[in-house]
Amino acid sequence: MSSSQFFILCIILISSFPLHECENGKSVEASNAAKTLCMSVNCDNKDRNLTCACCLAKSKNRCYSSKSECVADCKD
């Protein structure tokens, strides 16, 4: 590996560090307020009007009949 390739690799690694710092959302307070906890999805393929709210948290993969139930459980 030439020195110029090594230099470019170092720049890429150093520039990706701030992105990793903000990944969890705890380092920047504004990102916590804008974070969406639940996503509306279609619950039944036969009935397109039947929607559920599914939790987007990594540890919880549950869906609820209402968005308020989903938000209440996903906050924990």
UniProtKB/Swiss-Prot annotation:
Top-level lineage group: Eukaryota
Disulfide-bonded cysteines: C38-C54, C43-C74, C52-C70, C55-C63
GO biological process, one term: pollen-stigma interaction
Keywords recorded for this protein, A-Z: Disulfide bond, Signal
Signal peptide, first to last residue: 1-22
Tissue: Expressed in flowers.
Family, per entry: Belongs to the MEG family.
Designated name of the protein: EMBRYO SURROUNDING FACTOR 1-like protein 8
Native species: Arabidopsis thaliana (Mouse-ear cress)
